[in-house]
């Protein structure tokens, strides 16, 4: 029986023997494709080749790619753990041909690998082929079928519809028929009863797809029509975990050596055993799956956060924590303890797990602890919601309340339902679903983009010349229209461009495109699948005319200074804090720089000062730039160049060197460090567990900041009569102010006590109820304090109503003792109605409520209205 590691190696060895270049997995987190947050298929790293944006370096390629499917079209999240074969993070074994071999070889080698190398039983294999589509004018894929007939009986070759057997990259782009290979893993007696043919693509857990061979031969245009691709592409993907299940004779991916070490560790933590309780088993499968996703995302540079890809990772982590909390009794952080087990099983194939072990553990632990606190808060809010619902004689809480718990506190619906069931209550699921759909629709509307077809003026690829030029003669290769949020923009591709496209943390260049007829402003430059795209608000009237591409040199120079400063900052941080410091992110703009790095405690003021001094010393030394352009990656490593985790590097790289600072980098930089001028750190903060952030200014921005500080200092000196020792004067002022504040607080307490005593002497007893009412100018906090003090002294039959004015704003306050609340009085209902008389509104709890308004003249009437509504 092959282990997971042996299976992975055998695939690579087989395709290497067929002339394929074995390439490393690309990062799971995508940085230069606006259509994707995560790598969700093996082909993602080759999109620029498939789209024709860049020539293929190798015409035959194979790899094992880390993938993540949790959002968009490929969304497996809710199925994960509930079945035997869906996952969030998974490995995709794949082989590709870019204009080389096509269907015959792809099918032949797939069969050879599965049957001759892995020794899978050919009688248990089925292949699907595209049945055709009359509405698309597409015939059955008879070519693929004819090749399959060389290996399989005809009853093992199944026609598949467009949904199952026509693969598309998206709404537009390369596409084509595909041929899926399915395997029947059922026992012999089951196979004898029902043919596997009848179960293919019917979600049977033991008749599953293991390999998809995609034959890309068309391009889908924006008008939905198809045109032939100039160069045909083979793109295959085989689910590694499913293949291991088939080879190891298991009925579930989770029973293989890919997941079992994790599941056993989880079971041990929970004091249970896998296979004894289905709900517990689901929880263990969820956690085993999700810990892989979270760990690999962090190694690839994506930390949990509240935005975009970071929010997806946080959501996955919280889903795992919630399953552990709800079903396995894990009330403390536990997932971070699984990392050594994950490293033991996958560290050899993915050494980045080992290199970043400490960071991954700290991030996961802090995220767990934060969410557990949130869960406790959510439970308290749910307890209050249940109490209020019961007080109103109901047993069903509203879906809106449940959605607020979910949306604001990350409190999942199934946990809400579980707690409600334990208390004999339910939730209105239809209302919850309606709220969820409204939120999704709002998100879809906000993100909706209409992208037109490329208008191709001439074929070609873009050459970036921006390292050497800021102006360059060029022409347009293609353009298209893009609509988003009621704005129409244009994306332009040039044959030569000096414009730097946003990447590596550095924002894109701006500038103009100039020809003899007009000037077009370039408002941004982005990368899409490594293709530089120039964004404009209008198109040239003569797009075929030659033009000059001119970069805004002031902004470029400011960006270059800030980017070079991040390199110096990185080196200085490692010198001051230690070699554990690694860059975790950056943002380089013309105005400032932001640098995220691994460090496990706050950087002290003294350490920041040392860092700043080291950077500025190197600036004063005016160290010249040494650019190593397009050198072999091994040569770069020999230089000692620092690479970033989560970045994908080619065989040849660019290295930026300022003396002892040596880094892989594709950004723009100053010719010598003296051009930076000066660096001033303006803030240091925490981004996530184990990750700190420094923000800084350079050059002219430092001068502006120093000017502002000097002006502020001058104003302060003037306020203190130009005293020679401003610090002493300010401290004296603060101390005196604190003393006066204390006197005011003491006075207010005396006033509160006096008012309370006066009110106690003037209690009116009406039908056995002790009524205290008044209208006075008084701060809201004082009224509240008095009300609660009175409630403590008059424990039964207290009815307190006050109309007060503070800063010309009227306030209505009602306090009721518990026995009156039990009798049916509700303070919140009373103030809500009476507040109309002061042109306001409010509410609160049954025993205490307040309302604000705009009309102080209505206070007396409002107080009387409260008494009237209460029947007093």
Swiss-Prot record:
Carries keyword Cell wall biogenesis/degradation?
Answer: no
Query: Which residues of this UniProt protein bind Zn(2+)?
Result: 563, 567, 665, 669
Q: Which SMART domains match?
A: tRNA_SAD
Q: Name one GO molecular function term.
A: ATP binding
Q: Which GO terms describe its biological process?
A: alanyl-tRNA aminoacylation
Q: Into which EC class is this enzyme placed? A: ligase
Q: Which residues form a coiled coil?
A: none
The answer to whether the entry has keyword Protease is no
The entry sums up its family as follows:
Belongs to the class-II aminoacyl-tRNA synthetase family.
> Which protein are we looking at?
Alanine--tRNA ligase
Q: What is the lineage of its organism?
A: Bacteria, Pseudomonadati, Bacteroidota, Bacteroidia, Bacteroidales
Q: Which gene encodes it?
A: alaS
């Amino acid at each position: 029986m092959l282990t997971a590691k042996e299976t992975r190696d055998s695939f690579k060895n087989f395709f290497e023997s067929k002339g394929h270049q074995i390439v490393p997995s690309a990062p799971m987190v995508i940085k230069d494709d606006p259509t994707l947050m995560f790598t969700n298929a093996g082909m993602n790293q080759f999109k620029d080749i498939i789209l024709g944006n860049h020539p293929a370096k190798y015409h035959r390629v194979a790899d094992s790619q880390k993938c993540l499917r949790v959002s968009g079209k490929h969304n497996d999240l809710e199925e994960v753990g509930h079945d035997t074969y869906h996952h969030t993070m998974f490995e995709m074994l794949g082989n590709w041909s870019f204009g080389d071999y096509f269907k015959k070889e792809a099918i032949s080698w797939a069969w050879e690998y599965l049957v001759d190398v892995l020794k899978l039983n050919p009688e248990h294999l089925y292949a699907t082929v595209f049945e055709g589509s009359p509405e698309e004018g597409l015939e059955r894929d008879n070519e693929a079928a004819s090749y399959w007939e060389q290996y399989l009986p005809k009853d093992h070759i199944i026609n598949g519809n467009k949904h199952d057997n026509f693969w598309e990259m998206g709404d537009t782009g390369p596409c084509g028929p595909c041929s899926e290979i399915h395997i029947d893993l059922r026992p012999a007696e089951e196979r004898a009863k029902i043919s596997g043919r009848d179960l293919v693509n019917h979600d049977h857990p033991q008749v599953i797809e293991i390999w998809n061979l995609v034959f890309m031969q068309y391009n889908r245009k924006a008008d939905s029509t198809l045109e032939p691709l100039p160069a045909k592409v083979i793109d295959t993907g085989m689910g590694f975990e499913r293949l291991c299940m088939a080879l190891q004779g298991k009925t579930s991916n989770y029973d293989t050596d890919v997941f079992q070490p994790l599941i056993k560790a989880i079971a041990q933590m929970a004091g249970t055993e896998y296979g004894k309780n289905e709900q517990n088993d689901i929880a263990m499968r969820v956690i085993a799956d999700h810990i892989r996703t979270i760990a690999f995302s962090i190694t690839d540079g994506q930390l949990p956060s509240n935005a975009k890809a970071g929010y997806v990772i946080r959501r996955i982590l919280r889903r795992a924590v919630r399953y552990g909390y709800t079903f396995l009794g894990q009330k403390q952080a536990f997932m971070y303890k699984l990392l050594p087990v994950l490293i033991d099983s996958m560290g050899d194939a993915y050494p980045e797990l080992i290199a970043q072990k400490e960071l991954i553990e700290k991030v996961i632990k802090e995220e767990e602890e934060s969410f557990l606190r949130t869960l406790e808060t959510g439970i308290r809010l749910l307890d209050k919601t249940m109490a209020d619902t019961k007080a109103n004689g109901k047993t069903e809480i509203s879906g809106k309340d449940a959605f607020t718990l979910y949306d604001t506190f990350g409190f999942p619906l199934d946990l809400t339902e579980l707690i409600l069931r334990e208390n004999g209550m339910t939730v209105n699921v239809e209302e919850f679903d309606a709220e969820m759909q409204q939120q999704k629709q709002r998100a879809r509307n906000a993100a909706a983009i209409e992208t037109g077809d490329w208008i191709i003026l001439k074929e070609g690829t873009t050459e970036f010349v921006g390292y050497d030029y800021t102006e360059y003669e060029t022409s347009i290769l293609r353009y298209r229209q893009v609509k988003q949020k009621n704005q129409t923009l244009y994306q332009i591709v040039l044959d030569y461009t000096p414009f730097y496209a946003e990447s590596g943390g550095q924002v894109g260049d701006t500038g103009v495109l100039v020809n003899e007829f007009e000037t077009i402003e370039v408002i941004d430059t982005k990368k899409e699948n490594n293709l530089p795209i120039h964004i404009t608000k209008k198109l040239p009237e003569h797009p075929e005319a030659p033009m000059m591409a001119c970069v805004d040199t002031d902004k470029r120079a400011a960006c270059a200074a800030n980017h070079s400063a991040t390199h110096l900052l990185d080196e200085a941080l490692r010198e001051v804090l230690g070699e554990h410091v690694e860059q975790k992110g950056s943002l380089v703009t013309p105005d400032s720089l932001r640098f995220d790095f691994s460090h496990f405690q706050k950087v002290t003021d003294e350490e920041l000062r040392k860092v700043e001094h080291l950077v500025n010393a190197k600036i004063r030394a005016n160290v010249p730039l040494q650019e190593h352009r397009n050198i072999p990656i091994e040569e770069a490593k020999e230089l000692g160049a620092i690479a970033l985790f989560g970045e994908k590097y080619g065989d040849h790289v660019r290295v930026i060197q300022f003396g002892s600072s040596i880094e892989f980098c594709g950004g723009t930089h100053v010719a010598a460090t003296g051009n930076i001028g000066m660096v001033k750190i303006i803030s240091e903060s925490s981004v996530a567990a184990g990750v700190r952030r420094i923000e800084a200014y350079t050059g002219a921005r430092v001068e502006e900041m120093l000017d502002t500080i000097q002006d502020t200092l001058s104003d302060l000196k003037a306020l203190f009569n130009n005293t020679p020792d401003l610090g002493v004067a300010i401290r004296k002022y603060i101390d005196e102010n604190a003393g006066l504040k204390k006197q005011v607080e003491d006075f207010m307490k005396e006033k509160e006590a006096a008012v309370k005593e006066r009110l106690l002497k003037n209690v009116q007893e009406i039908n056995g109820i002790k009524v205290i009412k008044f209208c006075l100018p008084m701060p809201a906090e004082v009224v509240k304090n008095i009300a609660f003090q009175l409630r403590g002294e008059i424990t039964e039959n207290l009815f307190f109503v006050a109309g007060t004015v503070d800063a010309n704003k009227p306030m209505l306050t009602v306090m009721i003792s518990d026995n009156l609340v039990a009798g049916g009085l509700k303070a919140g209902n009373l103030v809500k109605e009476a507040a109309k008389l002061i042109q306001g509104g409010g509410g609160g709890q049954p025993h205490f409520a307040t309302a604000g308004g705009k009309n102080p003249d209505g206070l007396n009437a409002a107080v009387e209205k409260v008494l009237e509504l209460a029947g007093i």
